[in-house]
Amino acid sequence: MVLLLLIAIGIVLLIGWRLPLMGSEWSKQTIYVGLLDAWHGGSTDDKAYAMWIDDDSTEGVFEVKAIADEVGIKPAFAVIADRMEPAVADSIASWQKQGAGIVLHGLRHERWKDWDESQIENDINLSYARLHEQGFDTTKILKLIIPPHGCNTRIIRRVIARQGCQMISGASLVNPDRHVFQFGRIGIGPDTDLDAMRQMLQKAYDRKAFVIFSTHSSIPEIFSAEKIRDVLRMTKEIGFCFEPYQ
């Protein structure tokens, strides 16, 4: 019992400051990725970086682009390659030419959890092909992959690593820097506590950490344009660099 208590205290000390709200996101995946990051050590980046990724690529992307333009940053879109309406695909492809980031999020958003390596690889390859058909520059797609539904298995990680990409996991964490394999991301929604967010961001900035913000404009009830603007402006005010991810 004492050993378990010491382990729990150790986990809190190692990754507690990197959670969006203390005690609210202690999922198994968050703890797992957080401990891996702790092993990685401190930041090797020259400054603190931030990035905003919106998932699922539906009509909500137009509001995302408007917010990004208003705040003065380049957004990134986690696209479901074969589920975009033509107007959405055409718009995101044109925004890519203006500097928006494109992240793979599956061909049809099917769960990879129970798939074998060949099935996952095929899904990734078909995603690239489908995006190329829709006018995307596949040579400039970010080397980041978000497995659909937050799936995270050894097989998925192995395939993504073999693709020469980094993985954005379902962990809700600030990242130590831009060089770890598995990234966490911080959700922004209607219930986001701005004071708690500012405290976390200040600590992240002081440590030259890398923050990925996550939204789902495809789900209006958990999408808050007001909170997103507030958080992004706050992040810029603190001093984070939104330089496009390479």
Regions found by a protein language model. Name each.
Residues 12-14, 20:
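Hydrophobic alpha-helical segments of integral membrane proteins
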Residues 2-4, 38-40, 89-91, 200:
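Short, well-ordered helical secondary-structure segments
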Residues 48-49, 69-166, 170-184, 208-220:
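Metal-dependent polysaccharide deacetylase catalytic core of the NodB/CE4 family, i.e.
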Residues 20-53, 57-63, 134-137, 151-246:
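C-terminal active-site subregion of NodB/CE4 polysaccharide deacetylases
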Residues 67-73, 231-234:
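A short, Lys/Arg-enriched amphipathic alpha-helix followed by its capping loop at the start of a domain
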Residues 1-12:
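N-terminal Sec-pathway targeting helices
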Residues 64-66, 88-90, 115-117, 196-198, ...:
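Surface-exposed beta-strand edges and their flanking turn/coil or helix-capping segments
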Residues 16, 25, 38, 51, ...:
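Residues in intrinsically disordered, low-complexity segments of regulatory proteins
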